[in-house]
Amino acid sequence: MNQLRLEPIEKVNGTINIPGSKSISNRALLLATLAEGTTTLTNLLDSDDIRYMLASLKQLGVNYRLTNNNTVCEVDGIAGVLNADTAQTLFLGNAGTAMRPLCAALTLGQGEFTLTGEPRMEERPIGDLVDSLRQLGADVSYLKNDGFPPLTINATGLSGGDVEIAGDLSSQFLTALLMVAPLAKGDVNIKIKGELVSKPYIDITLALMAQFGVNVTNNNYVSFEIKTGQRYISPGKLLVEGDASSASYFLAAGAIKGGEVKVTGVGKLSIQGDVKFADVLAQMGADIEWGDDYIIARGSKLNAVDLDMNHIPDAAMTIATAALFATGTTHIRNIYNWRIKETDRLAAMATELRKVGAIVDEGHDYISVTPPVKPHTANIDTYNDHRMAMCFSMLAFADCGITINEPECTSKTFPDYFTQFNALAN
């Protein structure tokens, strides 16, 4: 087993240019594929999840060219839908941002497509998306367990019409449905069942669709109307913002042990909801400064917060470990969808926080963290989850340091994370 020892860090200072957003990268790759014209994507994330998407697109006959350390991608759009003359099997690892949108996109054309992934992917639900696609005439069948990958699509196109989709589990289901709706054979009217989680991620989807020339009527996130006959048109060039979830670790570092940490690539003009993580740090007492495309965090005495963090579920994980350096008990609420991510993040977070001495109350959809008087060192299991590894790097700011097991799991979104993290201490 690979291990990484992080020795205690007294102070952090510096500037970090955040790699491209995973959410934006994979959405943009798919939209560029379906669009008319050639799109140049810059600051594309170079990571496992993006590689699974790129490999699948290549297998499906899409032409693209990667340059500049895989961060610039020129995609030749197909001006329509994906078809296959022979049956195709696509392996998508544990990349939800590839599995969900491709599942929807492949129903639009003609052909037989089987989508598979790693064992954890077979535990991540997709049933709500498949149910909605079936309402529009899609033929999708499960190969193992109902509601979960692997699955096979016998594609003949989507009919259009009225469709209901559950909104309370993952915003990726709605994102996938929205992106394919303009290419259905008729108008699509989407009604949300239950409360929609992670609304800011839907805003990312709608903003990108608009950049590619497609309009969606958003009725206050209760329903969405998409007119048929719209086409995706390449915007020519598209800059992928830095990943706001990845920015959270460096901003937290600045708040805990700054000095001053500046992250560039995200800021006031960001389309990502996770930039609101900086507002949570400010509520905890950190000194936060905003620019159009940067955020600065400076160290200060931190206090606990009690907040609904449904709108920033990924970045909220960083608050759970930052809470170890705050006075009082921090409550993070309305985060059930942590349980269906790369691992059951609620259970994993509770287990690992207890290892360092925290008092933790783990509920169905919340976690409460009371810091120990003095955290103690531990070997932190990462559950093949990139965010677990990055969150627990915060323990380097305790006097004891920390050991991270299997640190290479950060390759999913931020392959050189620990190099960048350690650079702040030097």
From Swiss-Prot:
InterPro entries, A to Z: Enolpyruvate_Tfrase_dom (IPR001986), Enolpyruvate_Tfrase_sf (IPR036968), EPSP_synthase (IPR006264), EPSP_synthase_CS (IPR023193), RNA3'P_cycl/enolpyr_Trfase_a/b (IPR013792)
EC number: 2.5.1.19
Keyword Amino-acid biosynthesis: yes
Reactions mediated catalytically: 3-phosphoshikimate + phosphoenolpyruvate = 5-O-(1-carboxyvinyl)-3-phosphoshikimate + phosphate
GO biological process annotation, one example: amino acid biosynthetic process
Top-level taxon: Bacteria
Residues engaged in binding 3-phosphoshikimate: 22-23, 27, 170-172, 198, 314, 337, 341
Pathway, per record: Metabolic intermediate biosynthesis; chorismate biosynthesis; chorismate from D-erythrose 4-phosphate and phosphoenolpyruvate: step 6/7
Localization of this protein: Cytoplasm
Active site: 314 (proton acceptor)
GO MF term list: 3-phosphoshikimate 1-carboxyvinyltransferase activity
Predominant location: cytoplasm
Keywords per UniProt: Amino-acid biosynthesis, Aromatic amino acid biosynthesis, Cytoplasm, Transferase
Binding site for phosphoenolpyruvate: 22, 96, 124, 172, 345, 387, 412
Enzyme class: transferase
Keyword Disulfide bond tagged: no
GO cellular component assignments: cytoplasm
Subunit structure: Monomer.
Family that this chain belongs to: Belongs to the EPSP synthase family.
Function: Catalyzes the transfer of the enolpyruvyl moiety of phosphoenolpyruvate (PEP) to the 5-hydroxyl of shikimate-3-phosphate (S3P) to produce enolpyruvyl shikimate-3-phosphate and inorganic phosphate.
Listed PANTHER family: AROM/DEHYDROQUINATE SYNTHASE (PTHR21090), PENTAFUNCTIONAL AROM POLYPEPTIDE (PTHR21090:SF5)
Protein name: 3-phosphoshikimate 1-carboxyvinyltransferase
Species assigned in the record: Shewanella piezotolerans (strain WP3 / JCM 13877)
